[in-house]
Amino acid sequence: MESKEELRQRIGDLAFEVTQHAATERAFTGQYDDFFEKGIYVDVVSGEVLFSSLDKFNSGCGWPAFSKPIQHRMVTNHHDSSHGMRRVEVKSREAGSHLGHVFNDGPKEAGGLRYCINSAALKFIPYDQMEQEGYAEWLGIFDKS
């Protein structure tokens, strides 16, 4: 099993603080905020599949926003009352990585949710590299679009 220090070395300081200590990257600084290439987003810690570019939208909030995870079972929701706010924290199911928060102000036509996710918690797998990266089983989600 990977130690915390080995994990920090593998994913970097910011990703470690975000995923392991629920830190938040500064708005408009993450690499995936204004990024709309075709592919999937996985947990930077475990590689578990989380979100698709098909469900990503520009919310203007300063962080990547998604209308839903690829499958709802891939994330868990937790009550968060930190910083004097009442929010719903989103974590990856397998690794328990802090990803961000979910809000009820997303596009109505897409279900009304906005998953506001830290770029540092994600790794993007481009569509044309999904097979060689071990995500071939997820290629079919793009056939439906």
Swiss-Prot record:
Lineage: Bacteria, Bacillati, Bacillota, Bacilli, Lactobacillales
PROSITE patterns on file: MSRB
Coiled coil (UniProt feature): none
GO cellular component terms attached to this protein's record: cytoplasm
EC number: 1.8.4.12
The UniProt record lists the keyword Oxidoreductase: yes
Active site: residue positions: 116
Keywords: Oxidoreductase
GO biological process annotation, one example: response to oxidative stress
Protein name (Swiss-Prot/TrEMBL): Peptide methionine sulfoxide reductase MsrB
Family (UniProt): Belongs to the MsrB Met sulfoxide reductase family.
Catalytic activity from the UniProt record: L-methionyl-[protein] + [thioredoxin]-disulfide + H2O = L-methionyl-(R)-S-oxide-[protein] + [thioredoxin]-dithiol
Domain MsrB: 4-127
A Pfam family hit: SelR
One Gene Ontology MF term: peptide-methionine (R)-S-oxide reductase activity
SUPFAM superfamilies membership: Mss4-like (SSF51316)
